[in-house]
From Swiss-Prot:
E.C. number(s) listed in UniProt: 3.6.-.-
Protein's recorded name: ATPase GET3
Entry keyword annotation includes ATP-binding: yes
GO terms under cellular component: GET complex
Entries under PANTHER family matching the protein: ARSENICAL PUMP-DRIVING ATPASE ARSENITE-TRANSLOCATING ATPASE, ATPASE GET3
Complexes and interactors: Homodimer.
Protein family (similarity comment): Belongs to the arsA ATPase family.
Originating species: Coprinopsis cinerea (strain Okayama-7 / 130 / ATCC MYA-4618 / FGSC 9003) (Inky cap fungus)
Name of the encoding gene: GET3
Organism lineage string: Eukaryota, Fungi, Dikarya, Basidiomycota, Agaricomycotina
Superkingdom of this protein's organism: Eukaryota
Keyword Heme among UniProt keywords: no
Function of the molecule: ATPase required for the post-translational delivery of tail-anchored (TA) proteins to the endoplasmic reticulum. Recognizes and selectively binds the transmembrane domain of TA proteins in the cytosol. This complex then targets to the endoplasmic reticulum by membrane-bound receptors, where the tail-anchored protein is released for insertion. This process is regulated by ATP binding and hydrolysis. ATP binding drives the homodimer towards the closed dimer state, facilitating recognition of newly synthesized TA membrane proteins. ATP hydrolysis is required for insertion.
Length: 326
């Protein structure tokens, strides 16, 4: 195993005061939520205000802190400047549709056309979330993302909305006058087509601006969370490749749930598992040592739940964990 070139902590994230967006992502069940909550706690010590957002429909933030969060930013108990919110992208789009002024035939037809394009509903709900978040003026925003696969989908959203705008524009210019006439004859409101265009256009502008920020390493970074097993490491490598292709900065990997059996321990299961973990940990070092901070966290005997346990756990992100000696 080559010598570690970069400190095995996330202190670099706390030191980089220009960061605005921090994503924590990886395979399901590797401890993303615990990591993102712990990182947010550490950031709250050095930044003016921190917002922690979960876009995972499983809503693990409430479980982690033992406090109910909703789609509105709520102050986390025990902190003055840490806020959390849980968003379900699918319900966000539903609410938006209900709130939008879609009376009359034109409005509903335009909506149907827009949503017939794959990914438009997700893109629009993401834009709504971003519009909301941007208006809130937090110093830094930490995303606890859904498991890998969904994580990077938002990067294709500007293209998706461009497509929706193009399609609506073509259909609107062909059939718009006729449908508007029919709509007004049936008592519908005029201008629904323009409303729909305006909504899509403003959302596209928001997503394009946000994506530009996501590609700026001064403003955005992605923390990959994994465990020391083949599938998780494979998934992490895929994630790193994808992030690189999308030009999103990533230079921190958190390896969770590591076993450190005592020499005197005669637990066969523990030593076999420890050996396997060390093998994949060596591979991780080989792959990432040069450009990544690799943070090693232990498998604990109890769950990390509640503000106090999370505060305690968060210290291991900035001070390397030392396994107890025999």
């Amino acid at each position: 195993m080559s010598e570690e070139l970069l400190p095995p902590t996330l202190q670099n994230i706390l030191d980089q005061k220009s960061l605005k967006w921090i994503f924590c992502g990886g395979k399901g069940g590797v401890g993303k939520t615990t990591t993102s909550c712990s990182l947010a706690i550490q950031l709250a010590k050095v930044r003016e205000s921190v917002l922690l957002i979960s876009t995972d429909p499983a809503h693990n933030l409430s479980d982690a802190f033992g406090q109910k969060f909703s789609k509105d930013a709520t102050k986390v108990n025990g902190f003055d400047n840490l806020f959390a919110m849980e968003i379900d992208p699918t319900s966000a789009i539903q609410e938006m549709v209900e709130q939008s002024d879609s009376n009359g035939m034109m409005g509903s037809m335009m909506q149907d056309l827009a949503f017939a394009i794959p990914g438009v509903d997700e893109a629009m709900s993401f834009a709504e979330i971003m519009k909301h978040v941007k208006s809130m003026q937090y110093s830094v925003i930490v995303f606890d993302t859904a498991p890998t696969g969904h994580t990077l989908r938002f990067l294709s959203f500007p293209t998706v909305l461009e497509k929706a705008l193009g399609k609506l524009s073509t259909l609107g210019s062909r059939f718009g006058p006729m449908i508007s006439q029919m709509s007004s004859m049936m008592g519908g409101e005029a201008g629904s087509q323009e409303d729909m265009f305006a909504k899509l256009e403003s959302m596209r502008a928001v997503i394009t601006e946000v994506n530009t920020q996501f590609k700026d390493p001064e403003k955005t970074t992605f923390v990959c969370v994994c465990i020391s097993e083949f599938l998780s490491l494979y998934e992490t490598e895929r994630l790193v490749q994808e992030l690189t292709a999308y030009e999103i900065d990533t230079h921190n990997i958190v390896v969770n749930q590591l076993l450190f059996p005592k020499k005197s321990s005669n637990c066969e299961h523990c030593s076999v598992r420890h050996k396997m973990q060390q093998k994949y940990l060596a591979e991780a070092h080989e792959l990432y040592d040069e450009f990544f901070h690799i943070v090693k966290l232990p498998l604990l005997t109890e769950e990390v739940r509640g503000p106090e346990k999370l505060k305690e756990f968060s210290e291991m992100l900035v001070k390397p964990y030392q396994p107890p000696q025999d």
